[in-house]
């Protein structure tokens, strides 16, 4: 299969049709899930799909080294390429590498100001303007405020990109709303356009749409995360 066919047949095209226009530049999306459901894998799947569509991606992690994040991309790309018998694999891989930047911040060194300055530097000196910005491990939902989410949304507007965040749902101790969303997330929801949940169902993980911008009708998304390959698949 060539890259164009892969893009057309990607399960994430179904996700985009479920949310007319997708997340959209200048907006924040959040994926929720318990430990082990694949929140980071989902972010990487989103990133890889964007890269295969010639979009530049900035992946920021506060809980893993750059080598570890890169290894994760490599593993998922390899599994995807083998699953679809991807043509011209080396050339496509090189394109993915050129269009992706990974920044990691450890020991609580991350601030929005630092990533803003880094993004501006990349734009001015490296001709790198991400269409998608992925945050793995940020913010700390136990401590974050609506003002901090507003600042993240402002960053999405400044960079004219989509921003995806992840949030862990604790098995015990989390206060939840009627949808099962932790209240520590809902207190910032005015700044969140799309909410997704990775729901563990026996031997598979189902993707569930909880919020679609301001739409009162939320579509059923027929996509799962394969726990073996960490790839998105048709349900």
Regions found by a protein language model. Name each.
Residues 35-36:
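The conserved Walker
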Residues 29-32:
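Short hydrophobic/aromatic beta-strand immediately N-terminal to the Walker A/P-loop
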Residues 167-235:
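Phosphate-binding/switch region of NTP-binding enzymes
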Residues 40-107:
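Conserved P-loop
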Residues 100-159:
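Phosphate-binding/switch loop-helix module in NTP-utilizing enzymes
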Residues 59, 132-136, 161-171:
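Structural recognition of the conserved hydrophobic beta-strand(s) that form the central parallel beta-sheet
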Residues 8-22:
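Pre-Walker A adenine-sensing motif
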């Amino acid at each position: 299969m060539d890259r164009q066919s892969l893009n057309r047949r990607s399960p994430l095209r179904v996700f985009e049709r479920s949310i007319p226009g997708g997340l959209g530049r200048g907006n924040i999306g959040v994926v929720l899930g318990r430990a082990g459901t694949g929140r980071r894998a989902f972010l990487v799947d989103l990133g890889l799909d964007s890269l295969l569509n010639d979009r530049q991606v900035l992946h920021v992690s506060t809980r893993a080294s750059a080598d570890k994040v890169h290894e994760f991309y490599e593993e998922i790309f390899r599994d995807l390429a083998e699953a679809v018998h991807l043509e011209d694999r080396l050339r496509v891989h090189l394109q993915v590498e050129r269009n992706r930047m990974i920044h990691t911040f450890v020991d609580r060194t991350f601030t929005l100001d630092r990533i803003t300055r880094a993004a501006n530097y990349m734009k001015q000196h490296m001709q790198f303007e991400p269409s998608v910005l992925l945050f793995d491990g940020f913010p700390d939902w136990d401590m974050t405020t609506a003002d901090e989410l507003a600042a993240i949304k402002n960053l999405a507007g400044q960079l004219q990109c989509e921003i995806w965040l992840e949030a862990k749902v604790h098995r015990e101790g989390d206060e939840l709303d009627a949808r099962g969303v932790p209240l520590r997330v809902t207190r910032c929801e005015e700044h969140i356009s799309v909410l997704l949940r990775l729901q563990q169902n026996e031997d598979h993980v189902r993707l569930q749409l909880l919020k679609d911008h301001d739409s009162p009708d939320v579509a059923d998304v027929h996509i799962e995360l394969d726990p073996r390959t960490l790839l998105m698949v048709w349900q």
